[in-house]
Design a protein with these regions (language model features):
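Primarily marks hydrophobic transmembrane alpha-helices of the MFS/SLC 12-helix fold
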Residues: 72-75, 267-268
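Intrinsic disorder in cytosolic terminal tails and internal cytosolic loops
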Residues: 1-6, 184-194, 374-413
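Helix-to-loop junctions at the C-terminal end of transmembrane segments
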Residues: 58-71, 155, 250-262, 348-349
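Helix-loop boundary and gating motifs at the non-cytosolic
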Residues: 4-52, 204, 215-225, 236
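Intracellular juxtamembrane helix-capping segments at the cytosolic ends
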Residues: 111-124, 303-317
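C-terminal ends and interior cores of transmembrane alpha-helices
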Residues: 80-94, 272-286
Length: 413
């Protein structure tokens, strides 16, 4: 078993490397959205949604590759794929080429995140897993926010910004491959079936689905809702930034709570907090002093659902199944993020503009009920008392950029 200092160093390297990935991703999503508008592509929505299609496919297919070749080689392969596709993008300007290349980027990013999350889970002791994932989420959220700042000085028609993104992915690749690390042992078990996961950790599956639903709806539709309410654009921008900052602020405290108490109870309380805040948001005046604190609460409750669900699922599954579990949960969340805007927009069109908030509240109330029943009625299923051993590999760390989803909606409109 590795020394605690070595494990902490590996976790730190993984978090920093993936933060570089998210810094590039945040910059990349906005850059592509703006460039698509400048180039006046025939199908801008298709170009922008290709990332999510690739991400979903990657979430479905990458787990077995990671288990077959090991975490370090898989991380290098996925980061190299993203860097190569990004480098070619400014050289082949056209709708079809960009659809293919953006799908490749999404596939590679899904692989990077599955690799990272399963690696982090294996390195962290079960008693510390919530804290580790909260630090990971803080790093990725902060990097996403900083990525938006890079666009201010970027010449979107030049090749330089794309080279910057390639360099960031390359730096992340170097950090991970050059580190003295012992990644998790590759699994020889058959592919994880969804039936096994849903029977073993049903609350985690429901939670990831609901997290994707409300996350996709929030970042894609809430800006449009605020614009319909005649909210100034500067206030809309501050609202979305406040939501991201709320996600940052909540991560570590919620992670500690989920390590101390039953994660299912924590999920139920987070869901109730989000649902009540979403309903209150509908009736608030549109002054900054009222809606910005509300945005912090919404972002905080929303952004902590996914990491708590992942930690809960890994508590329930054997250590050599964490790669497959991470891949399945990312896919569930990704599908939810695709369906969320579609369902929310349909409700907004059929009923009223406030329907998006009622939809999000209803979705998390389902999770609150399921998690609450599981936490209060049944005994705790967590295996935290079992030692979590770190083993050598046989061969050879959210969700997708929510800010990009918002950009995609505006570009499509």
């Amino acid at each position: 078993m590795q020394q605690p200092g070595s494990i902490r160093a590996q976790i730190g390297t993984l978090v920093f490397a993936t933060s570089l990935i998210q810094l590039a991703n945040g910059f990349f999503g906005t850059l592509v959205s703006l460039r698509v508008a400048v180039e006046a592509f025939e199908a801008p929505g298709l170009v922008l949604s290709a990332y999510f299609a690739g991400f979903t496919l990657g979430s479905l297919r990458c787990s077995r590759l990671i288990e077959r070749i090991g975490h370090i080689r898989a991380y290098a392969a996925f980061a190299g794929l993203v860097a190569a596709a990004t480098a070619v993008l400014p050289l082949l300007v056209g709708s079809l080429a960009w659809v293919v290349l953006r799908a490749m980027v999404g596939f590679g990013c899904a692989g990077i995140f599955v690799t990272t999350e399963s690696w982090l889970s294996a390195k962290a002791l079960p008693s510390d897993r919530g804290r580790v994932f909260s630090i990971y989420m803080v790093g990725t959220f902060l990097a996403l926010a900083l990525g938006q700042l890079l666009i201010a000085r970027a010449d979107i028609k030049a090749i330089g910004p794309f080279n910057t993104i390639v360099a960031l992915f390359a730096l992340a690749l170097i950090l991970v491959t050059a580190a003295r690390a012992e990644p998790p042992r590759a699994s020889t078990e058959p592919a994880l079936r969804y039936g096994v996961l849903t029977r073993t950790a049903p609350i985690a599956v429901v939670g990831c689905a609901m997290s994707g639903l409300i996350g996709g709806a929030f970042y894609a539709l809430v800006p449009a809702w605020m614009q319909d309410q005649d909210t100034p654009r500067a206030t809309i921008a501050l609202f979305m930034l406040a939501a991201v900052l709320g996600g940052l602020v909540f991560q570590i405290p919620v992670g500690r709570l989920s390590d101390r108490f039953d994660r299912r109870i924590v999920l139920a309380l987070l869901s109730l907090g989000f649902a009540s805040t979403a309903v209150v948001m509908v009736f608030l005046p549109r002054s900054r002093s009222m809606i910005l604190p509300t945005a912090v609460l919404l972002g905080g409750f929303m952004s902590t659902l996914y990491p708590v669900c992942v930690a809960h699922a890994h508590d329930r599954m054997p250590a050599d199944r964490v790669v497959a579990v991470s891949g399945r949960l990312i896919l569930v969340s990704g599908l939810g993020s695709v369906l969320g805007p579609l369902i929310g927009a349909s409700l907004m069109a059929r009923f009223e503009i406030d329907g998006v908030f009622y939809f999000m509240a209803a979705a998390v109330l389902v999770l609150a009920f399921v998690a609450g029943v599981g936490g209060f009625i049944t005994s705790s299923p967590m295996h935290r008392e079992v030692p979590f051993e770190i083993l050598m590999p046989q061969a050879g760390p959210l969700a997708h950029d929510p800010l990009e989803a918002s950009e995609q909606t505006h570009a499509a409109q």
